[in-house]
Design a protein with these regions (language model features):
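ATP-dependent carboxylate/acyl-activation modules
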Residues: 1-197
Length: 197
C-alpha cells in the first residue's frame, strides 16, 4: 500500500509542476498502471482541469501513444498444477504478451453483463445476457461476455467462447473492444451499468 501511496504522491507533485501529460515520464505512467490506477485516477492525480470524461480520454490517448497497453491473461483454474487453457480472461499491465490470439475477423459479438447484483438489478439481467450469448452462438458468431459477478450463469465456462472477468468501466470495456474488434456489442441486457457506459 505504501508503494501505491508513494506513486499517488509522485503524480500529484508532478501535476503541480506540469500541465501536459506528454511531459510525464513513461516510467511513472507505467508504474501507475501496473499498480492499478485507472485513467480517471491518473487524470485526477495530475490535476487535470476540465471535464473528467475528457481527462480520461486525454490520459488514455497518451498512454496508447507511448505503448502502455494492458495484456490479456488466462485465469489459472488449476492452481499451476497443470498448464491451464481456459476461456476465463482478465486484463493486466503486469505482463508482456497476451495469452490468447486475436483474429480481428469481426466474427465475435460482445455482451456486457450486469456486474454485481443490487436492488433493482438481479438474475433477470443475467438471464437476458445468457439468452443473448446463446443466440449469438446459434447465429455463428463467437460469444464474448464481460462481467465480474461470479454468481451469475453468464460467467459459467460453457456459456460463452470468452469471458472477461473484469470491471464494467469505460476504460476496461474499450481495452477489450480494441483487442476483440467485434462485429457488435450488446449493452441492453445488463441493466443500468452497461447502459450508462
Amino acid at each position: 500500500l505504501q508503494h501505491i501511496m508513494d506513486t499517488s504522491k509522485e503524480m500529484h507533485e508532478w501535476g503541480n509542476n506540469h500541465k501536459q501529460i506528454i511531459d510525464m515520464s513513461d516510467e511513472l505512467l507505467r508504474k501507475a498502471k501496473v499498480q492499478g490506477f485507472s485513467d480517471f485516477q491518473i487524470a485526477r492525480a495530475i490535476g487535470y482541469e476540465g471535464d473528467m470524461e475528457d481527462g480520461i480520454l486525454y490520459v488514455r490517448n497518451h498512454r496508447k501513444q507511448v505503448g502502455i497497453l494492458p495484456v490479456v491473461k488466462q485465469i489459472d483454474t488449476l492452481a499451476a498444477e497443470y498448464p491451464a487453457q481456459t476461456n476465463y480472461l482478465y486484463l493486466t499491465y503486469s505482463g508482456v504478451a497476451n495469452d490468447v490470439k486475436y483474429l480481428g475477423d469481426h466474427k465475435s459479438i460482445v455482451v456486457l453483463g450486469s456486474g454485481a447484483y443490487r436492488i433493482g438489478s438481479s438474475v433477470e439481467f443475467d438471464w437476458c445476457g445468457v439468452q443473448a450469448l446463446q443466440t449469438i452462438r446459434k447465429e455463428g458468431y463467437r460469444s464474448v461476455m464481460i462481467n465480474y459477478n461470479p454468481e451469475t450463469v453468464s460467467t459459467d465456462y460453457d456459456m460463452c467462447d470468452r469471458l472477461y472477468f473484469d470491471e464494467l468501466t469505460f476504460e476496461r470495456v474499450m481495452d477489450i473492444l480494441e483487442l476483440e474488434n467485434p462485429h457488435g456489442v450488446i449493452v441492453s441486457t445488463g441493466g443500468q451499468i452497461p447502459n450508462n457506459l
